[in-house]
Every structure is written in C-alpha cells, then in structure tokens.
C-alpha cells in the first residue's frame, strides 16, 4: 500500500479523520502498555513510529554486523510481513520464497540467521534454540508480546513522521508521546530536517540521536554509470531509492513506483521489460524487490541490476558504545532478577 498524500501534511481530510485516529490511538496505546514476555537473552528492537520505509533493514544488518564484532551470536526475528508461513521457521533462502516468508527476511537470510514467526515469543524460543545470544527484532516496536531491552527507532530525515497524527489521520502507529517514552535511541537516516522536532523532543528526555545515510555499493554504481536506467521499486519510499540513484550520478530516465511489498505479476514484469527494450534502458531495482521477483530468467537476461545499500553511520564509535552499554545493562537486569 502507498501511504496517502495527506499523511505528509495537516489537511481538512486529516482533521476529519481525527475521531477515528483517537479511537485507533487509544487501542494501540492500551496494547503497547501490556507487559511483554521476558526471555533469557537481550532483545534489541529496530523499529519506527510509523508505517512505510525508513531504513530499518539496513540498520538491522549494520547492528548484526556490530554484534558479531562483539563476539555475540545474533539472530534476527521478523513477523515475515507478506509471507504465508505462520512459523516459527528459520528462513532458508535456498528453500523459501518471499511469498512464504516475506521479502525482507528472505533478503537478510542470505547473510544472517533469520527466524520468521507471527508469534514473536515462539520465534524467540526458536532463535534461542539456535544459540542466539542476542535477538534483533526487525520491526515490532508497537507489538507487546516480547519484552524489549532496547528500542532503536529509525526515521527518514526527509519524511520525518509526516503530519504527526495517528492512523488513519496520519502515519503514526500509536500516539507519539507513548512511543517516545519507550525509545532508547533515535537514528535519523539521510539529509533533511523533518525529523529534527522528534530529535529535540527525545533529547529533552536524555535519549541520544544518531545519524547516518544509506550508501549504495560503489562497484554497482560504477557499473551503472553511463547507462540510462529504468528504476522501479515496491518499497515504503520508492522516491528515496530513485533519489539515491540520481545522487550517485546514475541517469534515471524513467521511474516506476509500486506499493510497498508489491507482489509482482507476469504483466508487471512484461511491462517493465517492454519499456526497457523499447527505450534501451537498463532495469534497476532494490534487493528487497529482487527477493520478491524470485527466479525470473527473462529479467536476468535483460540485465536486471539490484542495487545493494548499506547504512553508513556518522559516529560508529558512539553507536558501538551505546550497544555495549545497553547489552551490559540488559544482562545486569537479568542477573539481579535471578538473584531475587
């Protein structure tokens, strides 16, 4: 689904939906306040305040890489949005498809252990049976089932939190004050000032703000330079992907945005191939979209390129110190709890 335009700014339609937003917000707040199940290992949640893309997946992968450097054994836990399997199941990229486990888990499972489960407690149990020393939740900030030791919230610097209102009046999944109360750190990705008011609000509560940007793979960028491309993406913020291509010096001759987690049909693929062949364009998409496209020989023959992106942090040492401190505090709480 593409988010409505009125979610980005306050408008009459947004105002008219406020009564429904108040009801939705009250239900969401009541749900968030429920105590979650505590487990034997620390749980770090990478989430956001709103629906749509913000950069959670690259953040999750960066966090996992850091945890491995710290001699931890991280396992990613996801609900597998868009997948048919309830789980819990460990994702096998050679056996599973995006239709079964979701595009993000399938993409991440190529480099990190990933468990998919609609029941997050059951998923955490499976992750611990795989000797996880830390569980990294990809999304699930508003879900109360599993108690979280650390909540790292990711916000896009250009989009911020839209009009700051709750669904359906705006993009927020729950009232902002409650979400801020449960935030341990804020990560702002990209250039822009739309997230600054949230950062200021959290700073007043002593919550640190980190900053970073998404960096495309240099070798892939170099290979695409000098070519005109047809860029397509079915992610939370396709425009950010198109902007990343342009900022890298790639000529984007045509754009085709799709809804987030869009299941590509044969007609979609045929239309993309026809346009690319007609205008002499190279097809470029995201790694998430490539996971959903699956095995499409005609796309491979046409030279489809998926552009890998990674999170580049402005203060890697600060991020490292934050994670080490939070893990230490989480384990200390468990030690003190076991002594009672």
From Swiss-Prot:
UniProt keyword Translocase present: no
Biological process according to GO: lipid A biosynthetic process; lipopolysaccharide core region biosynthetic process
This enzyme's EC code(s): 2.7.1.130
Pfam families assigned: LpxK (PF02606)
Domain of life: Bacteria
Molecular function (Gene Ontology), one example: ATP binding
InterPro entries cross-referenced by the UniProt entry: LpxK (IPR003758), P-loop_NTPase (IPR027417)
Keyword annotations: ATP-binding, Kinase, Lipid A biosynthesis, Lipid biosynthesis, Lipid metabolism, Nucleotide-binding, Transferase
Name used for this protein in its record: Tetraacyldisaccharide 4'-kinase
Function per UniProt: Transfers the gamma-phosphate of ATP to the 4'-position of a tetraacyldisaccharide 1-phosphate intermediate (termed DS-1-P) to form tetraacyldisaccharide 1,4'-bis-phosphate (lipid IVA).
Keyword Signal: no
One GO CC term, this protein: plasma membrane
Pathway participation: Glycolipid biosynthesis; lipid IV(A) biosynthesis; lipid IV(A) from (3R)-3-hydroxytetradecanoyl-[acyl-carrier-protein] and UDP-N-acetyl-alpha-D-glucosamine: step 6/6
Similarity-based family: Belongs to the LpxK family.
Binding annotation for ATP: 50-57
Catalytically driven reaction(s): a lipid A disaccharide + ATP = a lipid IVA + ADP + H(+)
Signal peptide: none
